[in-house]
Amino acid sequence: MKFIDESLIRIEAGDGGNGCVSFRREKFIPKGGPDGGDGGDGGDVYLQADENLNTLIDYRFNKRFAAERGENGRSSDCTGRRGKDIILPVPVGTRAIDNDTKETLGDLTQHGQKMLVAKGGYHGLGNTRFKSSVNRAPRQKTMGTPGEKRDLLLELMLLADVGMLGFPNAGKSTFIRAVSAAKPKVADYPFTTLVPSLGVVKVDDSHSFVVADIPGLIEGAADGAGLGIRFLKHLERCRVLIHLVDIAPIDGSNPADNVAIIESELFQYSEKLSEKPRWLVFNKIDTMSDEEAEERVREITEQLGWEEDYYLISAATGKNVPPLCRDIMDFIIANPREAETQQVAPEEVKFKWEDYHQEQLAEYQFDDDEDWDDDWTEEDDDEDWDDDWTEEDDEGIEFIYKP
């Protein structure tokens, strides 16, 4: 299946249903009063993480998704049916971004996690809502509000504990093949790896970690050279970066310069990513004697001014690979993954349409109080008075709806 890690889609929440203007008409009840019901709320749009998906290919061609509109209110105080929600399944590790405002709406990092990305419109009010002691036959209603509509950018970022960095042909794919059951393509030409891949490294019966291999970086990647830096986002959730260095490049380049280039490209992409723990691992020591390899690595670290620990391995033969994996596992255990979101106490959500109905009711009440004495005529005695009115209605508007 083709690996797709970005997709732009259009999502539209359902509009709210309109309120209804209606009056009760039954035998022997000629003036039954208002009985127009409210409309239904529009359907919402959700994203839900699914661990059985590993690509956004389902959204490559199907680009528009719309929730159902709420039904209009009806007579006999019947409320319109709420619009049906739609739930879009996405792979675990998907980030949702508003493409117009560039606002990050959230990350889905756990199976079954659900996120609201478009809120449906609020329902309109029927004329029953406007009944009062001075407005016995209201003919007012409100319309449903429109649902949210937005262009949503979906970005898939792999969830891995360890990320691999390095120039093309540094041996990243060979390393993953050596330590896991993953079988990425390996060949003697640059950019053999075209898409990211994951491998699970089992250190012992009870400990394992996930390593991510991305296509190699070259100088100018931040400006689009090679495959660019689009795949670096897959390393943002890694806890440690393994910078694999070829100590004997076939093109004769200086390994120290190659390390500096990767550091520069990493910083240009994200300062936060460049500050992650990064280990230098010198590969292909099987191409020379141990003494020569140690001498060359010493020269490289002196040129870089590298004062931290480093490793010498041969991914092809497996030399010194197990100790490296054990050290990685110890680091992961000692540095648990940071929570993606802080656990905060839930707050009462105030939706943008909450005051809309209050303002409409207050406006109509004010108009009725002003115009009641001036516009009243004897003919109004034949209007639809509310026969079931009681003293409880004398308190003003009967506001039943609570959002």
UniProtKB/Swiss-Prot annotation:
The gene is obg. GO terms for biological process: ribosome biogenesis. Belongs to the TRAFAC class OBG-HflX-like GTPase superfamily. OBG GTPase family. GTP binds at residues 166-173, 191-195, 213-216, 283-286, 314-316. NCBIfam families: Obg_CgtA, PRK12297.1, PRK12299.1. Keywords: Cytoplasm, GTP-binding, Hydrolase, Magnesium, Metal-binding, Nucleotide-binding. The lineage of its organism: Bacteria, Pseudomonadati, Pseudomonadota, Gammaproteobacteria, Pasteurellales. Disulfide bonds: none annotated. It is found in: Cytoplasm. Residues 160-333 form the OBG-type G domain. Residues 365-397 have a biased composition (Acidic residues). Its EC number is 3.6.5.-. This is GTPase Obg. The keyword Magnesium applies. Its cofactor is Mg(2+). Residues 1-159 form the Obg domain. Mg(2+) binds at residues 173, 193.
